[in-house]
Design a protein with these regions (language model features):
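Ubiquitin-like/PB1-type beta-grasp interaction modules and other compact soluble beta-rich domains
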Residues: 1-81
Length: 82
């Protein structure tokens, strides 16, 4: 089934996307499909997206796991700090 997925972007991703956006996705789909769809929306973000992690329900998920519900997705870019 195709559904709308809410995505929240953090940090450097906000240079390329709004803090919150929605994409349409055919479920079930691997989480890497979210990144694929975002690359189509903004190809300039591809390098950064290749290094991002996805979180759902406050837990990181493997990109190969299947997304089966329309729960929100949080896209976390790499960060450094001290």
């Amino acid at each position: 089934m195709e559904t709308q997925i809410q995505i929240t972007c953090f940090a450097a991703l906000r240079k390329f996307f709004d803090p919150q956006l929605n994409i349409r996705l055919q479920l079930p789909a691997a989480y890497h499909s979210v990144i694929y769809e975002l690359k189509k929306l903004n190809p300039e973000a591809a390098d950064l997206l290749d290094h991002c992690r996805i979180a759902v329900n406050e837990c990181f998920v493997p990109l190969t796991d299947l997304k089966t519900t329309d729960e929100p997705v949080y896209l976390i870019p790499p960060s450094s700090g001290g």
